[in-house]
Regions:
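Donor-binding and catalytic core of enzymes assembling or modifying cell-surface/extracellular glycoconjugates
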Residues: 1-77, 81
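Nucleotide-sugar donor-binding patch of glycosyltransferase catalytic domains
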Residues: 38, 67-135
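Mid-sequence helix-capping/hinge segment at a functional interface
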Residues: 22, 133-138
Length: 138
């Protein structure tokens, strides 16, 4: 998040479902930026889907909201485990292929640990991807 805020004048919206609100607010407080807000009071799936459809970009793990965003052809950045059954090759979203960027941890015994993905290395790809998406106007 801090990497994106240092490169772009943008709003970051942290979404939180049931039971996730406290963690989202803790993260927002840790970042301490007026450009970061928490959206945790939606009125269900339809309301949440409307917010995703309005997004300029959606970043998440390989979860339902990532795939729902892609159904609106919103540019997506996904973080996936590196096991054969979980890789982006199998679970890539359905948005246009040039509108998705995927990251996995290194192969090995900790291939399910998304914390092993280097954010600094990922930003090397993320920043130009975001720039390209926003210049193209999605």
């Amino acid at each position: 998040i801090q990497g994106l805020l240092s490169e772009f004048d943008c709003q970051i919206i942290l979404t939180a479902g049931p039971g996730e609100s406290e963690k989202a607010h803790e993260l927002a407080a840790k970042i301490d930026s007026q450009n970061v807000v928490v959206y945790d009071k939606n009125k269900g799936l339809v309301d949440f889907a409307h917010s995703l459809a309005c997004a300029d970009l959606f970043i998440a793990g390989s979860t339902g909201p990532l795939h729902l965003s892609s159904a609106f052809n919103v540019p997506t950045i996904g973080f996936y485990p590196n096991s054969q059954s979980s890789q982006p090759r199998r679970w890539k979203p359905i948005n246009d292929a040039d509108k998705h960027l995927a990251f996995c941890p290194p192969k090995g015994k900790d291939e399910m640990n998304l914390g092993l993905i280097s954010i600094d290395d990922a930003l090397i790809e993320i920043v130009p991807f975001v720039r390209k998406m926003w210049q193209a106007g999605n």
